[in-house]
A protein has these predicted regions:
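Conserved AMP-binding/adenylation subdomain of ANL enzymes
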Residues: 153-172, 179-204
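Short hydrophobic alpha-helices that are characteristic scaffold elements of the AMP-binding
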Residues: 45-51, 57, 73, 181, ...
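Conserved AMP-binding/adenylate-forming core of the ANL superfamily
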Residues: 1-25, 32-38, 42-46, 63-68, ...
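ANL superfamily adenylate-forming
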Residues: 84-126
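Conserved pre-ATP/AMP-binding loop-to-beta segment of ANL
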Residues: 116-134, 141, 166-172
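ATP-dependent adenylate-forming carboxylate-activation enzymes
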Residues: 15-18, 35-36, 56-71, 83-85, ...
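Conserved ATP-dependent adenylate/AMP-binding module captured primarily in the ANL superfamily
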Residues: 21, 60-91, 155-174
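Conserved AMP-binding A3 loop
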Residues: 8-11, 130-157
Length: 204
């Protein structure tokens, strides 16, 4: 649910498949998601998993230097951007001297209704690295923390099991915080989606 529309799971999957047509397809390909919270952010993120890639969420308020550092460290194949972050991303790519491809999520918004790709789900091995989160810690430059699907599934099970049924098909979760942080990413997006519950996207 967004301030302007309600999106079904079928519509979400259709949009993810559309975005996946532009996301790098090779297994373990790294792709940055550099944008403010939006439904396009969600489609971009899950399209990376659709193609068995590794997602790297980055703070939408990051500076050119911040993004250039992550680009140089992670060497991603592509970076999803919004209209607000595109210029910063392009300057960072030039500064880092990498060949990362810029993908504009705004260009795909509203096109999914015409997508005719075959319906396929997201498949993975528990040991596959699925996301790299850059965290600054207390000193020095941010460190890229690699998480596997098993890491996420353990957390999801802990809050969605019969013993602790925080998320279920009848629950609704409000996404308030930026999704590049692990807590909102897992706790307000991935876990509710895996539990087939409703998420409500707060405008940022």
């Amino acid at each position: 649910v967004t301030p302007t529309e309600e999106i079904s799971y079928a519509e979400m999957l259709e949009n993810i498949r559309l975005f996946a047509r532009y996301t790098p397809e090779q297994k373990e390909a790294k792709t940055i998601v550099f944008a403010e919270n939006s439904v396009e952010w969600i489609y971009s993120f899950f399209s990376i998993w659709q193609n068995k890639g590794i997602a790297i969420p980055v703070d939408a308020s990051s500076t050119v230097d911040d993004v250039a550092y992550i680009l140089n460290d992670a060497r991603p194949e592509a970076i999803w951007v919004s209209g607000q972050t595109e210029e910063t991303a392009r300057q960072a790519i030039e500064k880092a001297g990498v060949d990362t491809v810029v993908l504009r999520m705004d260009d795909l918004s509203g096109l999914a209704a015409h997508d005719e790709t075959k319906e396929t789900g997201i498949s993975f091995e528990d040991s596959d690295v699925c996301v790299i989160l850059y965290t600054s810690g207390t000193t020095g430059f941010p460190k890229g923390v690699m998480l596997t699907f098993k890491n996420l599934l353990v957390n999801i099970d802990a809050i969605s099991s019969k013993e602790v049924p925080i998320f279920n098909k009848n629950s609704s979760t409000l996404i308030l915080l930026p999704l590049h942080h692990v807590m909102p990413l897992v706790g307000t997006l991935v876990a509710p989606i895996f539990s087939e519950s409703q998420v409500v996207l707060c405008p940022t």
